[in-house]
Amino acid sequence: QRVFEALRTFDNSPVTEIYTQCPDGRGLGLAVGNRLKKAAGFHGVEADSEKIILGLTGGTGAGKSSALAVLRKLGAVVLDCDQVYHQMLAEDEEMQKEGSRAFPGVFRPDGTLDRRKLGQEVFMKKEQLEKLNAIVYRFLVPEIQRQLAAAENGVCAIDAVNLLESGLDEDCDRTVAITSPTELRVRRIMARDQITEHYALMRITAQKPDEYYRGKCSCELNNDADTAEEFQKTAERFFKRLIRSVREEKQNRKI
């Protein structure tokens, strides 16, 4: 009775989603649970009983950072592949040796990476970039998989520009392409990095187009919003629906 009294307080509220703990599935608890599902239209899911892995990818300026901020707000563990990669470059001696052999001189005498020099080695040079990526994937993918395995049940999000190329998409329940019109991406990159329109466009054209991500990912989140706040509201609705869908799918497999 207390559960239904509490639910009635939301009758005239704009709230779109309500979560309530379902009673024990025996005796009176079974009756209340059935009423929640049938009369009140609730869907039964086991909250955080399993791990849900989402992979986010897309080009620079599309809005991945804003989307990830929403996922963090929803309680997700976010694995930033770029951050893990740079941490490994600083700490993993085997990875450093492999990088030094392939790209002599990109590491300074103190062992730190000269990112500008490495960038010059691979920017707009397909063969060099492929060589670098092969090294990165060999070390990075097992580390991301290790961190995923160590994470508690719930939602995990992988943030990776090369999610598809590295094969990490195979570890995901859903892959999400974050896309956005080129003119908006240019504006965001110019404001974020304090660079000219010419250089912003160069960065975009050096990466794969939205059509590539759209065609290979299981779903798309388009960022055509004028402000980050507007996009985050859209992203929150999108991810809530997506997470609920994956949870229900996993639950149905058990039945």
Task: Please state what every model-predicted region is.
Residues 142-150, 155-192:
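ATP-dependent NMP and nucleoside kinases share a basic, alpha-helical "lid"
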Residues 65:
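Walker A/P-loop
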Residues 62:
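ATP-binding Walker
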Residues 1-41:
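A C-terminal functional module that forms or caps the active site or interfaces directly
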Residues 2, 7, 13, 143-144, ...:
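Small-molecule kinase domains that catalyze NTP-dependent phosphoryl transfer to phosphate-bearing small molecules
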Residues 83-153:
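ATP-dependent small-molecule kinase phosphotransfer cores
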